[in-house]
């Protein structure tokens, strides 16, 4: 198949504002559709060639720079302290996205608070590294979306937590639905994914991927090496994590829906959002003795393991928490409502705002509380 397509490097324009964004997005979209088609046909040489064309195109570079300079992290610099704010800086960013001589800089490590009081480490790349990752994300996402598990909902276009909850409701609300639930918890998923597995299975430029994985990070002026995992904070990291976890649903379906098994007795359902997942089965024994070992073996190949303390098997009548919701059957009828932990965190946030502003006029305090209350109510508006 002929992969030739007319792609310019850096056209002679007057600057950032002269870019025809409609044409750029159309060219990128056309190449992404061709990458997805080649992936479905398993023509991997064709995929690599089309990825090469996309990542060298002016359109791809411009769209990538626009993405990283217009998202919520656009004012957060990496270790070089630079951000691309002016049109001239953005144009220079487009011109800088070349593989030749490219060497990513270490990430700037920061810690953000979690709802449980602990902190989550984030690695902040430089603007150039962010743009290069965004460029390759354009080339890798068509592959990941084509090969993704059907019931994977995290970090994917046009999918959300509400879709994951709806999927659970559709599969578990019937009388004949499986009644036992395996709540899966992967121990340090982003921090422990095997670099060897990623380099062997992710269809992109391996030398570039290795540079990103081994870039390391700076914390309190000290350089730290990275020997495993994908840094939380990198634009491409969620897609790499998703691709590492994809394939489990297919393996479960092939194992428990093959001939010789009665569908009702061995029915298994699986729903995943990022590194959180649940798996339903007809009995505790099935989940404990067959499903859990299969999942553990799948994770082990990728350098991951299930948390013994947090991975649990529960009955649907007792309910389980997933993505801030509590899913439970009451006398055979499924109800989904905010989980106790989610409600507690919400009330703590409201109390903290009130305590932090004891002298604030009521109308100003209401102005600070409203976004928090509205956000929580909006997230839970589809339940029960």
Regions found by a protein language model. Give the residues of each.
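Active-site-adjacent bridging/hinge elements
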Residues: 103-115, 210-225, 367-370
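Phosphate/adenylate-binding "loop-and-lid" substructures adjacent to NTP/NAD/dNTP-binding pockets
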Residues: 47-119
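Core structural elements
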Residues: 56-63, 363-379
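Short, solvent-exposed helix-loop connector elements
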Residues: 121, 225-230, 351-365, 375-384
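Charged boundary/loop elements
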Residues: 14-73, 138-154
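Extended, highly charged clamp/arch subdomains and adjacent linkers
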Residues: 1-18, 38, 113
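Conserved polymerase palm-domain catalytic core
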Residues: 96, 100, 147-151, 156-159, ...
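A conserved non-catalytic segment of reverse transcriptases
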Residues: 302-368, 372-374
């Amino acid at each position: 198949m002929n992969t030739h397509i007319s792609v310019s490097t850096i056209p002679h324009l007057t600057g950032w504002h002269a870019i025809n964004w409609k044409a750029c997005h159309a060219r990128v979209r056309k190449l992404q559709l061709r990458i997805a088609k080649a992936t479905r046909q398993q023509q991997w040489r064709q995929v690599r060639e089309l990825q090469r064309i996309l990542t060298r195109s002016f359109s791809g570079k411009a769209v990538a720079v626009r993405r990283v300079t217009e998202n919520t992290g656009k004012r957060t610099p990496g270790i070089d302290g630079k951000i691309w704010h002016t049109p001239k800086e953005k144009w220079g960013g487009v011109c800088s996205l070349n593989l030749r001589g490219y060497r990513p800089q270490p990430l700037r490590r920061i810690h953000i608070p979690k709802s449980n009081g602990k902190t989550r480490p984030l690695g902040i790349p430089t603007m150039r590294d962010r743009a290069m990752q965004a460029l390759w994300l354009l080339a890798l996402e068509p592959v990941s979306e084509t090969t993704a598990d059907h019931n994977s909902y995290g970090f994917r276009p046009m999918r959300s937590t509400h879709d994951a909850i709806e999927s659970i409701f559709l599969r578990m609300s019937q009388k004949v639905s499986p009644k036992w639930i395996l709540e899966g918890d992967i121990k340090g998923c982003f921090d422990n994914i095997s670099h060897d597995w990623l380099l062997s299975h992710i269809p992109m430029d391996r030398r570039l991927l290795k540079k990103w994985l081994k870039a390391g990070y700076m914390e309190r002026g000290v350089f730290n090496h990275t020997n495993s995992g994908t840094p939380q904070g990198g634009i491409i990291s969620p897609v790499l994590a998703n691709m590492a976890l994809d394939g489990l649903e297919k393996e479960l379906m092939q194992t428990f829906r093959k001939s010789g098994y009665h569908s009702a007795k061995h029915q298994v359902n699986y729903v995943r959002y990022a590194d959180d997942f649940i798996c339903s089965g007809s009995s505790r024994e099935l989940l404990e003795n067959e499903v859990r070992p299969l999942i553990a073996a799948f994770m082990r190949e990728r350098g991951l393991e299930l948390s013994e303390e947090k991975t649990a098997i529960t009955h649907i009548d007792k309910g389980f928490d997933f993505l801030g919701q509590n899913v439970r059957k009451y006398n055979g009828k499924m109800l989904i409502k905010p989980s106790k932990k989610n409600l507690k965190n919400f009330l703590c946030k409201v109390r903290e705002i009130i305590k932090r502003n004891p002298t604030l006029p009521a109308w100003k305090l209401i102005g600070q509380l409203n976004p928090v209350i509205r956000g929580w109510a909006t997230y839970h508006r589809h339940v029960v």
